[in-house]
């Protein structure tokens, strides 16, 4: 009897040891699996990141390169969007806290003869049915160069892709009721060509312009009250619209302005009226 009890106890101890060993082995396998899964996820992320196209970097230009850009090149055709005159000199934007449509027309942009950073601008704005003339200036204060592989061998006439930042002040006539001043920052992304010309760079969708090429971002300040309202306008309004108003554009192939924003002045976006002329006429 005593011998039987000893054998039973020995069997129970052996079973317990086996269970503990199996549990330890199971825990070890689970831990190893967690590590393996973690490494797999990390490896997948690394491979995913490696497969992404290289980021476009903005590099500060040398003082000499900055001087060359300002002195040798005239950026006024970019402000005027001269490649697609005349209607393209009109820029669309958002004004006020409700982001109602506003249009800005640049009638003339001239580079100052003595100060290569200074550009003089005249034009008109249209907000709802109010058309107001303005004049002012843009001052270019920084220039940067893109380090990018977007320049193909077919674009041998491109010297480089650049971005300039500056400030603007556009003053409405003080004698007019409800007049004020537009002021803020301006960003332009463009290419410098070997023939000393410039053109917009259409391949970029990073930084402030978001592919809009030319962006004025600031506020309008009332002369009378000193109160301000936000304003932003751009060459390619579709590029920034969705960051201002939710679902501003709809459609994949045939992109259009969302009808729900027609009440904010976007119902006649495609109408060809030369509102900036003293004697408006339909455009052909």
Task: Please give the residue ranges for each predicted region.
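Charged, amphipathic alpha-helical segments
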Residues: 71-72, 98-106, 137-155, 177-205
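Short coil-to-beta-strand transition motifs
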Residues: 129-133
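Low-complexity, Pro/Thr/Ser/Glu-rich flexible segments characteristic
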Residues: 20-46
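Bacterial signal peptide processing site
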Residues: 16-18
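C-terminal motif of bacterial Sec signal peptides marking the signal peptidase cleavage site
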Residues: 11-14
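Tryptophan-anchored aromatic micro-motifs
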Residues: 42-107, 117, 121-125, 157-178, ...
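Sec-dependent N-terminal signal peptides
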Residues: 2-9
């Amino acid at each position: 009897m005593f011998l039987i009890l000893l054998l039973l106890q020995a069997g129970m101890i052996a079973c317990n040891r086996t269970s503990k060993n199996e549990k330890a082995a199971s825990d070890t396998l689970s831990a190893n699996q967690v590590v393996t899964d973690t490494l797999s996820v990390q490896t997948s992320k690394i491979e995913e990141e490696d497969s992404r196209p290289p980021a476009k970097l903005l590099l500060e230009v040398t003082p000499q390169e900055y001087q060359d850009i300002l002195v040798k090149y005239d950026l006024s055709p970019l402000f005027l969007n001269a490649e697609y005159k005349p209607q393209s000199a009109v820029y669309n934007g958002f004004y006020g806290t409700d982001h109602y449509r506003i249009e800005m027309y640049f009638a003339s942009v001239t580079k100052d003869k003595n100060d290569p950073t200074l550009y003089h601008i005249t034009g008109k704005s249209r907000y709802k049915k109010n058309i107001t003339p303005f004049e002012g200036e843009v001052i270019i204060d920084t220039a940067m160069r893109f380090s990018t592989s977007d320049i193909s061998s077919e674009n041998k006439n491109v010297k480089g892709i650049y971005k300039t930042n500056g400030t603007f002040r556009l003053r409405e006539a003080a004698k007019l009721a409800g007049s004020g001043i537009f002021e803020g920052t301006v960003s332009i992304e463009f290419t410098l060509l070997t023939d000393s010309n410039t053109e917009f760079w259409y391949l970029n969708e990073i930084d402030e312009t978001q592919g809009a090429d030319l962006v004025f971002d600031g506020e309008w300040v009332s002369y009378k009250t000193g109160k301000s309202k936000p304003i932003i306008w751009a060459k390619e309004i579709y590029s920034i619209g969705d960051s201002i108003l939710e679902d501003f554009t709809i459609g994949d192939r045939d992109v259009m302005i969302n009808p729900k924003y027609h009440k904010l002045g976007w119902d006649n976006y495609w109408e060809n009226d030369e509102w900036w002329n003293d004697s408006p006429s339909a455009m052909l």
